[in-house]
Amino acid sequence: MATTHLTAALALLCALLQVDIEASSWWSLAMNPVQIPEAYIVGAQPLCSQLPGLSPGQKKLCQLYQDHMPYIGEGAKTGIKECQYQFRHRRWNCSTVDNASVFGRVMQIGSRETAFTYSISAAGVVNAVSRACREGELSTCGCSRAARPKDLQRDWLWGGCGDNLEYGYRFAKEFVDAREREKIHTKGSYESSRTLMNIHNNEAGRRTVYNLADAACKCHGVSGSCSLKTCWLQLADFRKVGDFLKEKYDSAASMRLNARGKLVQVNSRFNPPTTNDLVYVDTSPDYCVRNESTGSLGTQGRLCNKTSEGMDGCELMCCGRGYDQFKTVQTERCHCKFHWCCYVKCKKCTEIVDQFVCK
């Protein structure tokens, strides 16, 4: 009898370990900045074997492009921060957890939220690698060689050192999609649909960065006159990328696998999603209450806006459970005056503010 219980316990432990392994992600590079060793130390473990969350294919790319790894981590961090900004007033607010999965079990569900997270993190890598190329931080790329835009005025020069979107896009595609492409699933399985979903949303994120990049120009001339302009390709502010993908989140398409193993739209009356749209295969879990099986952290203790009727309002954020009120003291600069020459002097003002948190 004891042997039976021991066997069952070991089986459960192995299953839990397997879930943890599968849930680990390259996103974890955002939580622990990658340090490239300046010199090789005899007996030291290779860098790539020490990095958590990398798939076999990603480890191979790491070995070939070690100098890229800090920027992959930087891109993931940029994506996570933007995700948290975009969802700061939602029940699910892109919270991270303290393990290699970064977002916990909630990413094991193929929901709209998962779709956004995959897209914004892939976008972050394109952003970081493209800029690193321009700044001369990587050994295999440099300034952009993008063709001159057709709508650029004839007398403006196309040159300078632009962000290398072409390289950033290609490398992000190879690295981020490596985990998905090396998976082998039974045709028609749920796992197969998740892989297709992830690849689609990764691509949507990358294309958003690529498509939003635009020409930036600098004037040249005597006494600041703009008799000549030099222009180059420049990344859009990442907030624009986040705003665009948040709109795509709101209009994301519900998908299912067809008999041929392809993702098709559940509601065929709508236009099929393009490569710029987000797709999902599962309905979102209930984010109102904490649930370890789905990874939902719930909204208990979240700040809410008593006067808002939107998602940040106490009625919706607290899911009808009610809220508690407390007072906080806030200090800010006030009564600022400019003094000649040349500084601004301010006083400090304090006020007592009512705040509300979900029960």
UniProtKB/Swiss-Prot annotation:
Subcellular location, principal: secreted
Glycosylation sites: 93, 99, 291, 305
PROSITE patterns cross-referenced by the UniProt entry: WNT1
Keyword presence, Chloroplast: no
Record's signal peptide: 1-20
UniProt cross-references to Pfam families, sorted A to Z: wnt
Protein name as it appears in the record: Protein Wnt-5a
Organism of derivation: Ambystoma mexicanum
